[in-house]
Swiss-Prot record:
Residues reported in the UniProt entry to bind Mg(2+) 2: E352, N354
SUPFAM superfamilies hit by this protein: Carbamoyl phosphate synthetase, large subunit connection domain, Glutathione synthetase ATP-binding domain-like, Methylglyoxal synthase-like, PreATP-grasp domain
Binding sites annotated in the UniProt record for Mg(2+) 1: Q338, E352
UniProt function note: Large subunit of the glutamine-dependent carbamoyl phosphate synthetase (CPSase). CPSase catalyzes the formation of carbamoyl phosphate from the ammonia moiety of glutamine, carbonate, and phosphate donated by ATP, constituting the first step of 2 biosynthetic pathways, one leading to arginine and/or urea and the other to pyrimidine nucleotides.
Family per similarity comment: Belongs to the CarB family.
Pathway participation: Amino-acid biosynthesis; L-arginine biosynthesis; carbamoyl phosphate from bicarbonate: step 1/1; Pyrimidine metabolism; UMP biosynthesis via de novo pathway; (S)-dihydroorotate from bicarbonate: step 1/3
Quaternary structure, from the entry: Composed of two chains; the small (or glutamine) chain promotes the hydrolysis of glutamine to ammonia, which is used by the large (or ammonia) chain to synthesize carbamoyl phosphate. Tetramer of heterodimers (alpha,beta)4.
Start and end residues of each stretch annotated as Carboxyphosphate synthetic domain: 1-456
Start and end residues of each MGS-like domain: 1027-1162
Enzyme class label: ligase
Source lineage: Bacteria, Pseudomonadati, Pseudomonadota, Alphaproteobacteria, Hyphomicrobiales
Protein name: Carbamoyl phosphate synthase large chain
Amino acid sequence: MPKRQDIKSILIIGAGPIVIGQACEFDYSGTQACKALKEEGYRVILVNSNPATIMTDPGLADATYVEPITPEVVAKIIAKERPDALLPTMGGQTALNTALSLKRMGVLDRYNVEMIGAKPEAIDMAEDRALFREAMARIGLETPKSMLANATEIKDADRKTHEAARTELKAKLSGAELDKALDNLENQWNLGETDRKQRYISHAMAIAAQAIDVVGLPAIIRPSFTMGGTGGGIAYNRSEFFEIIGGGLDASPTTEVLIEESVLGWKEYEMEVVRDKADNCIIICSIENIDPMGVHTGDSITVAPALTLTDKEYQMMRNASIAVLREIGVETGGSNVQFAVNPKDGRLVVIEMNPRVSRSSALASKATGFPIAKVAAKLAIGYTLDELENDITGGATPASFEPSIDYVVTKIPRFAFEKFPGASPILTTAMKSVGEVMAIGRTFAESLQKALRGMETGLTGLDEIEIPGYEEGEGSKNAIRAAIGTPTPDRLRMVAQAMRMGMSEEEVHENSKIDPWFIAQLKAIVDMEARIREHGLPQDAENLRMLKAMGFSDARLASLTSKRPKEVAELRNSLNVRPVFKRIDTCAAEFASPTAYMYSTYETPFVGAARSEAQVSDRKKVVILGGGPNRIGQGIEFDYCCCHAAFALKDAGFEAIMINCNPETVSTDYDTSDRLYFEPLTAEDVIEIMRAEQEKGELVGVIVQFGGQTPLKLAEALEKNGIPILGTAPDMIDLAEDRDRFQKLLMKLDLAQPNNGIAYSVEQARLVASEIGFPLVVRPSYVLGGRAMQIIHSEGQLQTYLLDTVPGLVPEDIKQRYPNDKTGQINTLLGKNPLLFDSYLTNAVEVDVDALCDGENVFVSGIMEHIEEAGIHSGDSACSLPSRSLSKETLDELERQTTALAKALKVGGLMNVQYAIKDGTIYVLEVNPRASRTVPFVAKTIGAPIAKIAARVMAGEKLDAAIAAYGEKPDPRNLKHIAVKEAVFPFARFPGVDILLGPEMRSTGEVIGLDTDFALAFAKSQLGAGVDLPRSGTVFVSVRDEDKEGVLSAIRILVESGFKVLATGGTQRFLAEQGINAEKINKVQEGRPHIEDAIRNRQVQLVINTTDSNKAISDSKSLRRATLMQKVPYYTTMAGAEAAALAIKALKAGNLEVKPLQSYFN
């Protein structure tokens, strides 16, 4: 059927900030959807609060709203834009839940907006655990034995009362008067939400208590309408049961949880299905989880296609997944269906389905080359699968052809437990990973070992690992059994280690429940390692190629034979053992593919030499190295820069070649670059690609400055291999990181920096610290995201840092060199990567400056003033652009210093400088002559694609010409609007972790608030980050002495807005002296009832709290945790408190308006 002509404009809801469970994959799907719908001539309206996304680039949609994704704000956008249709399936759970809220609020009916892609009834049936269970029973599919706990009866009664009030207003009023009355009614309803939610939770808890007798323990708890398993978990005892139920009911927007029988240890599979309105259904790909049931699929190591199913089992699962889509009513688009299979008797049960594009869809798209999101968007507007061409085969096949795979794909998740001391590393049904890596090989062994080295955690393959608690003797087996039986990020390596220590494959399976086929594959790798250790490296091509075909990296072979990777590479080259490149083409080479989407393999054909499908061009080419798997400190912002580099280089006439291994990102989409290599970012893998590309055409150079720390680490190896690096020279990047060289440069330029020192050993660290004095900031060199960076207040704290924190940074190869010498390990590490010490500047204002330079000319693109004081990592700080409080003289001086630094470092491209300003003096904290995570935020705010401009500069253009290619030169200091960037944190995923911020970065994502008024921009940034600013209630305030004057302004604004004030003793007395009436409440350590009780009883709606000593910080940890669990906004700086107070005042006045990004720049 042809596309619909009755629709002219379509609203797409994005996913918002990057959070655990919802990452870059929705930028990838949203970007594809925007392009697909614009291609068909529709007016596309987009809402997404995440500035670091490609989809929010102003050229992608016709109207781009970088506004908070809340039902109330999206309702304003609908009222303004009047779209004909709403597509909710491209923005994850956020978009689905927002769309359903808009439906329930009557907004879609009021403005006659049709939901396309998934009907509300289908979303409800898939996401509501009760309706889903009933639907599966109707088609004869089993679900695990379960029971629901919800508050449906009392919720229905509340809703009926609300609906009656709406009906009454509609009968009495009309026109603008009716609209205003309905809006007031909705506001009243929304203000009562917290109280209603508590009633619903209490009601549902009583029902849940009965489930233990029905389902038994252990039980799996799954909240409705949440993503990434938020709020869910596995309860092994009654106290865990009630704790998880409480959290799950709170997390579920519908206050409902499913309590399910345990299927722990069963095999888990997923089917990625696409259906059109003519009922054509295709399976894009099957995915198998190596980890058995009990671990969230986002935290599992997975393979595609499924490798341990018989054809009969596969066909049964295929038919079942199609039946699920038909029954649920997913008429158009992609869905993901999850199954569990009991390995003992083959019993198949359906776990759940996602009626939308998901994380697994992104993986399936990258694994097969099939653009699920693009196809789903076109199906939503009326096309059928047979009417759409498959882009990958250049239209040789229609989209109705099921993809076929002649390779194995492995995905491994990346975790960040080191950022959250106290968090449990045990994996459950609630997702905890922050990123993932994907690798492709001709065999499972090859793709697994490629994925392991692509993780960038220091692994070179299936490296050895220490078994926790292992000691020779009687109890040794128990430690091994516990290690392989407990799901943790390192379990696969523990399994390999158990087999190295003599455990049989049967015993490993019995304890880990991992399928015997995968265990046999791991055993083959372990056995081969033993042979290599015993016999050394083979000296002939055939046997060396066989090892490489199993996925062994040069670095792994070197470590097994006590050689250096360089020696292995030299042997390999002398024997001409080189990889070939194969194409991902959706059709297993049945049709020629014009799309250059490639992976490397060392396969040996039966006859002749292995054939490479790289088909290298003779054009001028530039290679862009991506950022690898997402992690805290290196995420979507760097992928945005890499994508912009590819777009700009294509504009400038170069062939853009991308190398990356992250399946979530836009950079690994088949049409972002001219050629894509889906490969690990290691020196060996990248150099092999360079050699292939150098066979024809001219390799102009490589861009290493856009992908974060990952590609920068490869710069030296690339240079040694004669590969030109574009932009700032690696030596200058090193100068900025090398404390001694950098200090000399600052002295030469007459720029100030805090009193500092450098330590190459534990002893030297103690001496340097005593010279500088406390408090001081310590950090390792050459790290991103403030890894292991701390503020040290005392000798004791320094001792803990040196002996507990630093050992966690020691790589495996050094540990193996000094197995029993902890100090030797630390000193070896510090000899190469010394510790950097700086005097900590208390109460200083921190400033981030982004700039562009072509070696001679400098353009300062943004001066951002942090709302948090210096000492909190810049990635975790809220900041405003333009600056709010800095004088013209200070801004002029910041520009002068930045220009001097850029010229001295001969920067070619982007540069970021961090400054602290204290008592009128500007101190340089650090300089990064590369892309920073603020680049997308600055670009969106000033209306200039600075990463594109930088890429053109790096390829040889002059700065002014590169700027002119994208319009007029902006004036970042004189904008008519103000933007606020706010960070988003994953603390709710890690119970027991303190939420206090410091110099080590812990945020996963960010949002932007954009307005002509600072208070409203800040309000939008808070709403976008999920902070629900109260409009009324009680504020609790307890601040240290030096903040008492500073807090007055915020408290006065809140009192004027009708807030009551609660305060601890000293703060209450001070406020009374200033004429502010505050009620006294006990600190936690002063006896009950205290402030934590008041927060847990929901008597406090806002908290302003600062502490001045280590003891006070630890004393107030439970208070901070309580605010997090009760979702109470919590501010720890006076600037933040005042901004929040101004925002609340503006929201109360009803001033929040929405504007598309394009309108800020005419």
